[in-house]
């Protein structure tokens, strides 16, 4: 092994992420870089080249971070190896951004020339600064008629404190400015500084399951080298494996003889169980292990919980296996078994937000061919019990009776909303409607304001983002972080069908909204549940108190059609007999609840509740 050659190779590596607010053109810039460096041929090139998940292409967003090795011949006559990592822009997937930054020395900070700095631009920049990365400002979409690159540079300097005087102006659509950007990567982003001669130390930043090769680990090599035949150890479990293949993504897998300190690539080692590795673990040399593991990642707790059940109970084991495989590729997903009297055996799943929940459900249905029922999402509540202990409630049906606890606390967030001056009024009105508490308002420039509210997380996760976009014509952007738990006047509302509580339909609401929400829920269920041969009573209740009710009338068979019209006694007798039969049927009949009903609570927006 020629160390001098390997060190020279290492000096020509550049590892960088592309970070930005959603829709500011990260994936388009990545496409142009792949095109200009001939990493993919013109025939193979397609939009969102690095978004290889079908769902990403359907939705037009990046969900998973993706890495690719790019070879670039610079103007100084030397060849460089770029490891480009594309990252998501949506707030739900910020954990993907933090993981990708840990594998880099630099970041391209992309800002839309027509929109300027947005909420996620700020959030992602702070992540990059925390990781001590070299940040290269990039002004994108300069081809748009509404583009104002100078204003975007001013905002970067004023709001982020970065020098934007030599920011690269590009158009991801036309390719203008991309050659200058490639040169900037060479000159401004430092080479990795890992020690090639030290024992192997590599960080697992992603992984996926392959039916033929087992678990494929995506790694950043911090120190040392790794090649096929080497014995490696995963430090968290102590388990040892023999490496069968190493390589890089370019953007399709390309085998290599060796990966060295600074490389970003993949390792396979006949790891058959998805439980044996975890994102954030450190890999080392089994014969000469490193003394200390790498710091890994801060585990981000779920924000939203929902029940997930197979439509056919026989698919329970398939769902469990699918969730385990998905968790390997989605470190933020959490799940544990749960049982519902209405839905049978399933799992209580934790997600980072509603988009994350939708994505997981769609991936399970598309990639694993499962039919699923999801219950309405809920946040984590804390019930302070009479004996002083705290019970964590992630399922509304688990909230104890009112006499058993002193108070219920719910999570609060600090919400930062960037909005044009013209829309400050509607935004403040929306926040107050969602039980928000005004904190402060900062004028960023003469056009935009940063409005800060303390708000219950439960109000944010449902339709707040959609309401915000519609009340500001799409111009507002949102970022939020959990600040802690507060005691509020919350109650559990049970939904009863023919006096039987349906656990999967229970929900928690603020007392001031409880009756309206219960009324809305019962009337919505009346529309969704098909008519039966017997009467169905739908009730909303807080404890023993019924606060709303709706009735689904039964089908009625004409039992009097044979009778002569002049025989009222016989007619009354037959109708009474029918009534007694229906009463018996109602007592023993099971009401079939359609899948739509379990998500009905999501459709209860403010206008519905207020009866507008």
From Swiss-Prot:
The keyword GTP-binding is annotated on this UniProt entry: yes
Catalytic activity as recorded in UniProt: GTP + H2O = GDP + phosphate + H(+)
Keywords: Cell membrane, GTP-binding, Hydrolase, Membrane, Nucleotide-binding, Protein biosynthesis
Annotated positions binding GTP: 23-28, 140-143
Source organism, top-level taxon: Bacteria
An annotated GO cellular component: plasma membrane
Record protein name field: Elongation factor 4
Record organism: Lactobacillus acidophilus (strain ATCC 700396 / NCK56 / N2 / NCFM)
Native organism taxonomy: Bacteria, Bacillati, Bacillota, Bacilli, Lactobacillales
